[in-house]
A protein has these predicted regions:
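Conserved glycine-rich SAM-binding loop
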Residues: 119
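Class I SAM-dependent methyltransferase SAM/SAH-binding core
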Residues: 122-170
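A C-terminal cap/extension of S-adenosyl-L-methionine-dependent methyltransferases
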Residues: 261-346
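Class I SAM-dependent methyltransferase Rossmann-like catalytic core
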Residues: 70-96
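A conserved beta-strand element that flanks and buttresses the S-adenosyl-L-methionine
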Residues: 183
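Conserved class I S-adenosyl-L-methionine
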Residues: 214-241
Length: 346
């Protein structure tokens, strides 16, 4: 659903583009600054707030050109561009955080890695930096996202990556061989229930012995606030019919929203138990990996650090859960970040 009502890209000399935004949630100007044809900075100036600077996609690794930016904005929208800019720095930080603590793979290993649902490449770029000697397959069902990703990749990384457009997520015929690591970042929640039950076993079968399946940034089904689509409290505890009625009135959707589309957008999130149940249909023994690394940071702090808009409801939830952690030691996070190891064949 397109949210941008108007968009103008006005070159100012050869160095700056300004994208004018009129959006029901975001407004103001998005400014891209270039030097010698390469993106150097991006800023969002809201109509009613202070200017905010963003770390642009593939910062520090891949040069982003004026053509890249135009493709990103015109293939999708200006609000999508803002989302991409907001997420990029967080995805790299979250990848380091989760992989350091849960995955347990040497960073210098010569692995074969699948980033399934790679989209425009945030998680793939983070993995490229984390595993400098690995080879990658980036797979997605959306061809236009892969086009954006191809436009970013520098020559040094193109030799390490094969990009594959998936035609049927239930069969995955385009994927050959086995993988040492399969990564799904912000993917599982967008699969319909039947797709989850068919896809995860297919991916698990393609995992090498002692390989890792990593699922990150998936909303937790039972968190007090539905953070992914509606930002409404308690909707996770409502029956489907009532949850759909609330979603239609949330301001993010309209009266034509169907339950199937709401599920596709990720309204119900997932649980670790559901993921394990889906994997259990495939061969191999499942072992959920846990961290033995003491650290003052945890998944609750990881969520709060990555939130771009700290609403009053989210702030209250964070404060309450912080007190729960202090009193009981229990860490409750709105996001599922989990890693499984395939320890042996059945």
């Amino acid at each position: 659903m397109a949210l941008v009502q108007s968009l103008e890209m006005e070159p100012h000399g050869a160095t700056t583009w300004t994208v004018a935004l009129q959006h029901r949630r975001l407004s103001g100007q998005l400014t891209f600054e270039f030097s010698n044809g390469l993106l150097r900075s991006a800023r969002h100036r809201p109509l009613d707030g202070a200017e905010r600077a963003y770390d642009y996609p593939f910062s520090g690794r891949s040069p982003v050109t004026e053509a890249n930016v135009r493709l990103l904005v015109t293939q999708h929208s200006a609000d999508f561009a803002i989302s991409e800019l907001e997420r990029n720095q967080y995805v790299r930080f979250r990848t380091d955080f989760v992989f350091d603590r849960l995955v347990g793979m040497a960073r210098d290993g010569h692995y074969r890695i699948l980033d399934f649902g790679c989209g425009t490449g945030h998680s793939l770029d983070a993995l490229l930096g984390y595993f400098p000697n690995a080879r990658f397959v980036g797979a997605d069902i959306a061809g236009r996202d892969l086009d954006v990703l191809r436009s970013y990749l520098p020559e040094v990384d193109r030799s390490r990556i094969d990009l594959v457009q998936i035609q049927d997520s239930a069969k995955l015929d385009q994927l050959d061989g086995s993988f040492d690591l399969i990564n799904l970042n912000a993917v599982f929640e967008h699969l319909l229930p039947a797709e989850r039950r068919s896809l995860l076993p297919e991916l698990w079968r393609r995992l090498a012995n002692n390989g890792r399946l990593v699922l990150t940034e998936t909303p937790w089904r039972w968190f007090p606030i539905e953070t992914h689509t509606t930002s409404r409290p308690l909707i996770n505890y409502l029956p489907d019919r009532l949850a759909l009625a609330v979603a239609r009135r949330s301001g993010h959707y309209g009266p034509d929203l169907t339950w199937t589309l709401a599920l596709r957008h990720g309204i119900r999130g997932a649980t670790v138990a559901e993921m394990i149940a889906c994997i259990d249909a495939a061969a191999g023994t499942i072992r959920q990996l846990t961290s033995d690394q003491p650290d003052s940071r945890d998944l609750l702090e990881l969520w709060w650090w990555g939130e771009s808009r700290h609403t009053r409801q989210k702030a209250l939830a964070y404060q309450g859960l912080s007190w729960l952690r202090r009193l009981t030691g229990l860490v409750v996070s709105p996001w599922v970040n989990v890693a499984f190891c395939k320890t042996s064949e059945a």
